Design a protein with these regions (language model features):
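Amphipathic alpha-helical dimerization/coiled-coil segments
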Residues: 80-119
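A short acidic, leucine-rich amphipathic alpha-helix
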Residues: 35-40
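Short amphipathic alpha-helical interaction segments
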Residues: 41-53
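Short capping segments at the starts of secondary-structure elements
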Residues: 26-32
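Short alpha-helical "packing" element that flanks the helix-turn-helix/winged-helix DNA-binding module
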Residues: 21-25
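Short, cationic-aromatic polyanion-contact patches
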Residues: 3-18, 32, 64-85
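A short, conserved structural fragment
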Residues: 55-63
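Residues within helix-turn-helix
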Residues: 33-34, 45
Length: 119
């Protein structure tokens, strides 16, 4: 089942490692980096990179105490954040598309071209 969940999470723009670590935190609660290294067997540097990605995606939270502990937000909150981020990127692409179409259509040489291609 976890493999299926990881695959589904990936459709939300989450890497396999992020999905796996998120599920670990969702199942275990608060953990330190050292505890996550022990649980997953992954290098500490990879855990830090993955945690930073999950923090950027608002899928986990970190404590203000030392040692820092990380915990997963609820799956609903995490997926809502992922959907909002994807929607933002889609809106950015739409704006860029409009700007590119206008720029290309404004070119002086464009006005004299036909709509078809000649080879």
């Amino acid at each position: 089942m976890e493999k299926t969940v990881v695959e589904r999470l990936r459709t939300f723009g989450i890497s396999e490692m992020e999905a796996s670590l998120y599920l670990t935190l969702l199942n275990t609660g608060q953990e330190t980096v050292g505890e996550l290294v022990d649980m997953t067997g992954k290098p500490r540097v990879d855990i830090y990179k993955t945690l930073n990605g999950l923090l950027e995606k608002a899928m986990i939270e970190e404590s203000v105490t030392r040692p820092t502990k990380y915990c997963a937000v609820s799956i609903e909150v995490a997926l809502d954040a992922a959907v909002l981020k994807q929607a933002y990127h889609l809106r950015q692409m739409e704006r860029s598309k409009q700007e590119l179409v206008e720029l290309v259509n404004r070119r002086p040489d464009r006005a004299q071209q036909s709509h078809g291609y000649q080879f």
